[in-house]
Amino acid sequence: MKVTIAHNNYDKTLETVAYLKKLLQKKNVIFDAKYPDIVITVGGDGTLINAFHRYENQVDSVRFIGVHTGHLGFYTDWRNYDIDKMVDALLLTKGQPAKYPLLEIKMLTESGDTRYHLAVNESAVKRISHTLEADVYIDDELFENFRGDGLCVSTPTGSTAYSKSLGGAVIHPRLKALQMTEIASINNRVFRTLSAPIVIAPDQWITIVPNVDHFVMTVDGARIDVRNAKKIEYRISKHSIQFDQFGHHHFWSRVQNAFIKDTEDNDKFI
């Protein structure tokens, strides 16, 4: 087993990382930052998502374990005081990983280039100081002509992130559905959109055709300035992000702990 540790640089995190490294070294665990089997992240959700993008080309062979040292962690199963238990579980348990759907983003430029991205949570298309004008297609059929600040397409687990703040539904990852939410759409006698989140089936796809030369696309919060894009296609990826199963909390327990209250009764959810 080859392991690497990704972390932020807060004092509490660095203390946890130092202890974790000593513990793994005592267990004769091999450290390999280039081709790891396990990526342990110490910090919060941002740390884990950054680590995913670092290893997204190896996503089919890498499992993630998140150690939480901040205030809120949706993807991080372990706390810094559980490190000993986590390492024992890592070395003793085998089994199928918990898998969550990823978002595949395919952007075609006017020059004919194709660019691909993967997202754990979401991708948004928007303009900063002007209205975004775009045509939205579902399965290559025109659905609406959008006018507004932007559009957000999310995965099921991403439905608890930016999409939720836009009024989107929270979706269980077993559904493997895409959700699109509007960002401040313009609706009047001239411009009309659905003005509600939409959820589409796993075998469907959403295409956004911008009617502007310049806009911003975000992928898990990372900003990309885009010029002369012909269209952006979103679909559920054939790849998944994989988490080590031991200690992995059920989805609705995560939602409850993140947004409603703390609970120790995690087994009541499936």
Curated annotation (Swiss-Prot):
<dbReference type="GO" id="GO:0005524">
    <property type="term" value="F:ATP binding"/>
</dbReference>
<keyword id="KW-0808">Transferase</keyword>
<dbReference type="InterPro" id="IPR002504">
    <property type="entry name" value="NADK"/>
</dbReference>
<keyword id="KW-0963">Cytoplasm</keyword>
<feature type="active site" description="Proton acceptor">
    <location>
        <position position="45"/>
    </location>
</feature>
<comment type="function">
    <text>Involved in the regulation of the intracellular balance of NAD and NADP, and is a key enzyme in the biosynthesis of NADP. Catalyzes specifically the phosphorylation on 2'-hydroxyl of the adenosine moiety of NAD to yield NADP.</text>
</comment>
<feature type="binding site">
    <location>
        <begin position="45"/>
        <end position="46"/>
    </location>
    <ligand>
        <name>NAD(+)</name>
    </ligand>
</feature>
<dbReference type="InterPro" id="IPR017438">
    <property type="entry name" value="ATP-NAD_kinase_N"/>
</dbReference>
<keyword id="KW-0547">Nucleotide-binding</keyword>
<dbReference type="GO" id="GO:0019674">
    <property type="term" value="P:NAD metabolic process"/>
</dbReference>
<comment type="similarity">
    <text>Belongs to the NAD kinase family.</text>
</comment>
<dbReference type="GO" id="GO:0005737">
    <property type="term" value="C:cytoplasm"/>
</dbReference>
<feature type="binding site">
    <location>
        <position position="147"/>
    </location>
    <ligand>
        <name>NAD(+)</name>
    </ligand>
</feature>
<feature type="binding site">
    <location>
        <position position="149"/>
    </location>
    <ligand>
        <name>NAD(+)</name>
    </ligand>
</feature>
<keyword id="KW-0520">NAD</keyword>
<dbReference type="InterPro" id="IPR016064">
    <property type="entry name" value="NAD/diacylglycerol_kinase_sf"/>
</dbReference>
<dbReference type="GO" id="GO:0051287">
    <property type="term" value="F:NAD binding"/>
</dbReference>
<dbReference type="GO" id="GO:0006741">
    <property type="term" value="P:NADP biosynthetic process"/>
</dbReference>
<keyword id="KW-0418">Kinase</keyword>
<dbReference type="GO" id="GO:0046872">
    <property type="term" value="F:metal ion binding"/>
</dbReference>
<feature type="binding site">
    <location>
        <begin position="160"/>
        <end position="165"/>
    </location>
    <ligand>
        <name>NAD(+)</name>
    </ligand>
</feature>
<keyword id="KW-0521">NADP</keyword>
<dbReference type="Pfam" id="PF01513">
    <property type="entry name" value="NAD_kinase"/>
</dbReference>
<dbReference type="Pfam" id="PF20143">
    <property type="entry name" value="NAD_kinase_C"/>
</dbReference>
<dbReference type="GO" id="GO:0003951">
    <property type="term" value="F:NAD+ kinase activity"/>
</dbReference>
<dbReference type="InterPro" id="IPR017437">
    <property type="entry name" value="ATP-NAD_kinase_PpnK-typ_C"/>
</dbReference>
<feature type="binding site">
    <location>
        <begin position="121"/>
        <end position="122"/>
    </location>
    <ligand>
        <name>NAD(+)</name>
    </ligand>
</feature>
<feature type="binding site">
    <location>
        <position position="184"/>
    </location>
    <ligand>
        <name>NAD(+)</name>
    </ligand>
</feature>
<keyword id="KW-0067">ATP-binding</keyword>
<protein>
    <recommendedName>
        <fullName>NAD kinase</fullName>
        <ecNumber>2.7.1.23</ecNumber>
    </recommendedName>
</protein>
